[in-house]
């Protein structure tokens, strides 16, 4: 994998943008609409993004208590799948078994 794709983590950037949006929608209770549209973003779990995760979870729990409507559209969730298809075109990747083969799951 090229070094350019390992330099940054989108999770911390997305967390910085989404948390204020959700906090704004808590009072007064407003509907929340989020559309994800990533194009080949490498989603890595860096230390900084893992530190931000509890803040995102707690903010979402506060929003959930307001019982406001929520809509999330996952346009492209296949960034890793696209990478696998690019480098593993010669065989079909079975999503159920492939994670166990590479050691992603116990």
UniProtKB/Swiss-Prot annotation:
Q: Which residues form a coiled coil?
A: none
Q: Looking at the record's lineage, which domain of life comes first? A: Eukaryota
Q: May I have one GO cellular component term?
A: chloroplast stroma
GO MF entries: ATP binding; ligase activity
Q: Which UniProt keywords apply?
A: ATP-binding, Chloroplast, Fatty acid biosynthesis, Fatty acid metabolism, Ligase, Lipid biosynthesis, Lipid metabolism, Nucleotide-binding, Plastid
Q: Where is the CoA carboxyltransferase N-terminal domain?
A: 1-106
| Family annotation (PROSITE patterns) | COA_CT_NTER (PS50980)
Write out the function statement from the record. Answer: This enzyme activity is not detectable in leaves.
This one is known as Putative acetyl-coenzyme A carboxylase carboxyl transferase subunit beta-like protein
């Amino acid at each position: 994998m090229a070094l350019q794709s390992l330099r940054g983590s989108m999770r911390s950037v997305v967390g910085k943008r989404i948390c204020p949006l959700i906090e704004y929608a808590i009072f007064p209770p407003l509907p929340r609409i989020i559309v994800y549209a990533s194009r080949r973003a490498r989603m890595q779990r860096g230390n900084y993004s893992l530190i931000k995760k509890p803040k995102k979870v707690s903010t979402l729990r506060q929003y959930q208590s307001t019982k406001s409507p929520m809509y999330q559209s996952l346009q492209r969730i296949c960034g890793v799948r696209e990478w696998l298809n690019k480098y593993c075109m010669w065989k079909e990747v079975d999503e159920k078994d492939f994670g166990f083969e590479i050691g992603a799951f116990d």
